Curated annotation (Swiss-Prot):
Protein name (Swiss-Prot/TrEMBL): Proteasome assembly chaperone 4
Family recorded in the similarity comment: Belongs to the PSMG4 family.
Secretion signal span: none
GO molecular function: protein-containing complex binding
GO biological process: proteasome assembly
Job of this protein: Chaperone protein which promotes assembly of the 20S proteasome.
Gene: Psmg4
Source organism phylogeny: Eukaryota, Metazoa, Chordata, Craniata, Vertebrata
Source organism per UniProt: Mus musculus
Assembly: Interacts with PSMG3. Associates with alpha subunits of the 20S proteasome.
Length: 123
């Protein structure tokens, strides 16, 4: 029983980090699973939307869809698609910031990429 729990724990990695972007404190929570990645981005503890993206052998652009939340807000799906392309994994993204300005979103994405370069084993 303990061996199977240890093996299961080795397949899951949790990583949390925060950044102050444009005077807003943004929190990032990453859960790396065996073949997938879950990323939550937000300032308050809410899960307002969820998107998923994954690579396909039929198209170089990863397929993506919104699982729940406001489908007119494509921030989560776009970020999931770009991260799926970068990691070659199935990526779930929940982007829960009210500021969806493209410049701010780019700052958020750059902070994620910076963290990926610093801690590749967490992604």
């Amino acid at each position: 029983m303990e061996e199977s729990r240890a093996a299961a724990d080795a397949d899951v990695s949790l990583h949390n980090f925060s950044a102050r972007l444009w005077e807003q404190l943004v929190h990032f929570h990453v859960m790396r699973l065996t073949d997938s990645l879950f990323l939550w981005v937000g300032a308050t503890p809410h899960l307002r939307n969820l998107a998923v993206a994954m690579c396909s052998r039929y198209d170089p652009i990863p397929v993506c869809t919104s699982l729940f939340g406001d489908t007119s807000d494509t921030t989560s799906t776009g970020l999931a698609q770009r991260l799926a392309r970068k990691t070659s994994k199935q990526v779930f993204v929940s982007y829960n910031l009210s500021n969806t300005d493209s410049n701010f979103t780019l700052l958020v994405e750059n902070r994620i990429k910076e963290e990926m370069e610093t801690f590749p084993e967490k992604f």
